[in-house]
Amino acid sequence: MVAVSKTKPPEDIKELYGLGQRDFGENYVQELTEKQALLPTDIRWHFLGHLQSNKVKYIASFVHLIHGVDSLKLLKEIDKQALRCQRVIDCLLQVHIAREETKFGFDEQELDDLLTSERAGLGALKNIRIAGLMGMASFTEDQDKIRAEFKGLRSIFDKYFKGPPTAPNASQSSAPQQPPTAISSAPAPILSIGMSSDYKIAIEEGSNIVRIGSLLFGARNKA
């Protein structure tokens, strides 16, 4: 579980940290860098928002997982900044599963081209690791629609990361094997779907990372 702490003060994060939570997610680069400088160094920081290429450099030295990678251009910039920091950065490719223009992400054909075409050049990006997929369901109370969107992403996930998702801290020996078209060497591929309003459906449909904000922190403060 990633505790979505955007707009929340460091004191609120410290409270959850004291209860054992270590994974926290932020949507804005400036807010993330400010909190990272103030809070314990063993926190695993996840970037959840739409990341602009020119801001990757500010988080490249410490970010644990970037959830919303939605272009090859962004992947290349993350790789460049990761090389500068002499590390490998885990990334999730965001897939556009909702029928809403406000959502970012690859469509299914774009994703296939990226992961299977040699022309995409993923093999040359040595300082990123595609660890799985991420998606956001439509903003609706229609649970059947949400379930259908999650189910569709699970099907896409299985195509490139074979076998059922397992918890990200599972042992490597029991992890599903990935096809050569996926460049990840992570022991447990990640399917990141589900937020406070739909996490139960997401887990039923195979999510192994949910992003929970309001259920943990209460209503979101205005940025």
Where are the model-predicted features located?
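Active-site loop ensemble at the mouth of alpha/beta enzyme cores that anchors a bound cofactor
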Residues: 223
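Divalent-metal-activated hydrolytic enzyme cores
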Residues: 208-209
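Conserved alpha/beta-domain cores
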Residues: 1-169, 183-197, 203-205, 217-220
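Cationic, low-complexity basic patches in intrinsically disordered or flexible, solvent-exposed regions
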Residues: 173, 178-179
